[in-house]
Amino acid sequence: MFWNRLEVDLNTSIHTPELAMSSLPMLATLIVVASTAVAQTPVSSQPKPADTEVWKPVPAIVTPGRTNADPPSDAVVLFDGKNLDAWVSARDGSPAKWVVANGVFTVDKPSGDIRTKRSFTNYQLHVEWRVPENVTGSDQARGNSGVYLAWVNGDGYELQVLDSYNNTTYVNGQAASIYKQYPPLVNAMRKPGEWQTYDVVWTAPTFNANGSVATFAYVTAFHNGVLVQNNVALKGVTKDVGLPEYKPHGPAPILLQAHGDPSEPVSFRNIWLRELPPR
């Protein structure tokens, strides 16, 4: 607009001789001011690749296991095939009495559930389990156990263990379900006698000072390498009867269930986890 006006002024001066001489000082001043304004107008900065490059903190180096099932260098090994030193009775804290043989341990139903000595918050968990080939029973009374991802004062969040190979039951109680909350996305069960794997990412809930929920617990789980729980928000601790609900807690142990059904007991091996930072 400024230059258009200047052009008009110049044209007027040129075609009006009596104004030409008197307008020259003003025109010179306008040209100087316009040139200065153009020179001082900042050139818009262009984005550079370096603007979005993050260099620190540098991720820690972790040496992976020989296979995806083997513990990486930063893993906490909970069962290495030798003993149950990392576990105690959930009933009274005494040494775990489940049977260890040939690199495997098997549920001892009379002695009850076992839990880890240590407590954890957020983690990546690897568990291998097997329903015996000669398993009998049906529905929930067939190879039943459970991995409680956090166990607090008699309550916990259960990832179901069950023979779900040609065994009909309610879908939020089959293998790889978040028990009584979320059915698995698919049934990835191998037949009895074959080893199953669970790989789980557990994000613990957090609580406000008054005990209310600040953030929900979240679970992502793979059964035999197949995604079965996709970052689901848990509704609370597992309830066999009634609706799930939250109770405030901090770090908690992991529990393995000795289910009271009469079927042949489940076995476990190769259990490890990696502790994860807060979200």
Short names for language-model regions:
Residues 8-9, 38:
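Short linear/disordered segments characteristic of secreted peptide precursors
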Residues 40-279:
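Carbohydrate-interacting regions of secretory-pathway proteins
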Residues 30-39:
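Hydrophobic h-region of N-terminal signal peptides that target proteins for export
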Residues 12-28:
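Bacterial N-terminal signal peptides that target proteins for export
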Residues 9, 19-22, 33, 43, ...:
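Hydrophobic residues within membrane-embedded alpha helices
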